[in-house]
Amino acid sequence: MKSISTYDFKGKRALIRVDFNVPLNKETLAVTDDTRIRAAIPTIKKVLEGGGSVVLMSHLGRPKNIPEDKFSLKNCISTIEKYLGFPIQFATDCIGERAFEKSAALKPGEVLLLENLRFHQREEKGDRGYAEMLSKHGDCYINDAFGTAHRAHASTTIVAEFFPNDKMFGYLLEKEIHSVDKVLNSHEKPLTAIVGGAKVSSKITIITKLLDKVDNLIIGGGMAYTFIKAQGGKVGKSLVEEDHLQTAIDIMRIAKEKGVTILLPVDTIYADEFSDSANMKEGKIGEIPDGWMGLDIAKESIEIFRKVILDSKLILWNGPMGVFEMKNFQKGTLEIAKAVAEATKKGAFTLVGGGDSVAAVNQFGLADEVSHVSTGGGAMLEYLEGVELPGIAAILK
């Protein structure tokens, strides 16, 4: 494995696996959140400043293995050009004859974007022949796509085999690994994890893993109601996973045995329907009337969580506190985001990861006020769980 910081790119074509799987406007197909594109720019610029040229490859969405306009990476061109400050080239088929002509003719300082890798079904199958064809676009390989590092696809894992002495992580992937390692391996205390989102079932592994590391575990979002019901609370028609009530009890027992403080909401904003125009009330979380559902944490919970966050030296946040997409139920998530930003100012290392909490800090304009916002939802969770990620292992081999 080489290091991007010391590698000599002069006269070389760098094949970079980026993660440009960005949301697009359904009508105009314009990029609506360019976080992932912005995050890849430092790696691209490093190659160009070192006298090399760049071939970018990525997937976008879940096409049915055939070209579709709504999944075309041409929709990202103007955004990439905006951040690079010059025009780039585009190849309409990542392994078409024209694509190879274009990549072979690249001059130092030039950038070529290949069309969506998933327009070929061989990408997700991790096909070796497909990976070998892709490898012909570059003299060295850089993986900078943390968002797909947990997938053993042709462009994320197999292609690395064809660059045994010329493969490396990009700056973004390096930073992602460093940030998670810092949370998992640092001896700074207290370490607080904030876990939200809808379902306990999707977070069991991560919570179990975190109980070995954290001092405090704050639980919010839809999953909190499963914990409250497991303790005998009345939660009305709030989201509850009936088949995971015992799981919640087990988690609380293990936390107690390990000396971890679990903090659950004590009050909630509840509504008579899942709508921004619903009737709303505020009350104790274990006393929600029948026919009503909890959709956000309320004042007292915010204050309790805030105090713990501000006293922490390391903070991991994964998952919102309520239905933050609706204005009436976003205050809990907004206030927790503000507290995490404030803790960062006080010197805490703060890592935000997982689709919805990332969307929240972006929506509230606080992404630049935390230490690191992870671009890899599933990949970050799997890495935190201690799973070996194929995209990372392929570079380290």
What is each of the regions a protein language model found here?
Residues 1-397:
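Active-site loop-to-helix "anion-binding N-cap" substructures in soluble metabolic enzymes
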